């Protein structure tokens, strides 16, 4: 299955639950950013950086955050951080696997599977235009904006 057809539950910027697929956004450029976990320091900073730059991003792209967290977790994260973009729940990591961001990771010598922080720009037809892999949170949204406004 191609990533355009994968359907995931998510919440819109008002917190309403919907089923989404990339093909739902045909005609719009999309920033699809994958992050490991709601309410962790790096993920919160990245989400807040996107939130704080939505006035600059919205005319150019639709921003969508994706993590393996469930809808309940996303809703709490969205409310706590006042997030103003779509969050998708990829609990079975179908979309993460389609974008090759579901990877073996290691912490304190323990290996586990998780999201490799990555961002993808999809064009109006849902095709990959640009990718940022192994993202460092600091300055990332500025880098994305720099690319979008060049």
Please provide the spans of the model-predicted regions.
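Chalcogenol-based redox active-site neighborhoods
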Residues: 1-150
């Amino acid at each position: 299955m191609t990533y355009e057809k994968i359907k995931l539950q998510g919440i819109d910027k008002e917190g309403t639950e919907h089923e989404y697929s990339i093909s739902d956004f045909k005609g719009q450029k999309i920033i699809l950013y994958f992050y490991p976990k709601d309410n962790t320091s790096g993920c919160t900073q990245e989400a807040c950086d996107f939130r704080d730059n939505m006035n600059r991003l919205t005319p150019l792209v639709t921003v969508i955050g994706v993590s393996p967290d469930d809808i309940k977790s996303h809703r709490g994260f969205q409310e706590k951080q006042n997030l103003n973009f779509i969050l998708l729940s990829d609990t079975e990591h179908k979309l993460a696997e389609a974008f090759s961001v579901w990877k073996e990771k290691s912490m304190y010598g323990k290996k586990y599977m998780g999201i490799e922080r990555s961002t993808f720009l999809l064009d109006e037809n849902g095709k990959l235009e640009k990718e940022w892999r192994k993202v460092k949170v600091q300055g990332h949204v500025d880098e994305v904006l720099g690319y979008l406004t060049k």
